[in-house]
Amino acid sequence: QIKLVDRTFNADPDRARQLFRFILDRHRRSHFHFEIAAHLLDDETLALLDEVPPGTFQFEIGVQSTQDATLRAIDRPAALERLEHAVRRLKSAGRVKLHLDLVAGLPGDSYSDFLASIDRVAALSPDHLQVELVKLLPGTPLRGRAVSGGLRFDPNPPYTVLATSELT
């Protein structure tokens, strides 16, 4: 299995299609894991992905949260409706395995917000739904805003958030 762990892999749709086509033309027996931004998958790319032999590609999609305010707070705005459209289309084609990620403990996310995110993402029927606690890595903008944002975290690796102003 070959993993490409760059969540901006498909930020340039033409480049992503070229790489997908290269793989499909030469490596149909290999397995590839991509981190992608599903809201950036356009119709042309989705049509190309209809050609993928089942089990060849797995997409890891970092949804993080389905709350717009939370996504803005972590500088990860996403067109959730477009993301959901892409995931539904990929799911209905049944060719790409879908691994969707949510993060617990994000600033601004209440317990009910987080449960709503789980419900909304689970409704997409991904092959795998992963929930992680947010980590405040040194040098990141989120860690820089931790105290003012009401985040308490373990100062030792992996720097897991222990409480937020909304969750304890």
Label each PLM-derived region with a short phrase.
Residues D42-L49, P107-S125:
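Catalytic cores of alpha/beta
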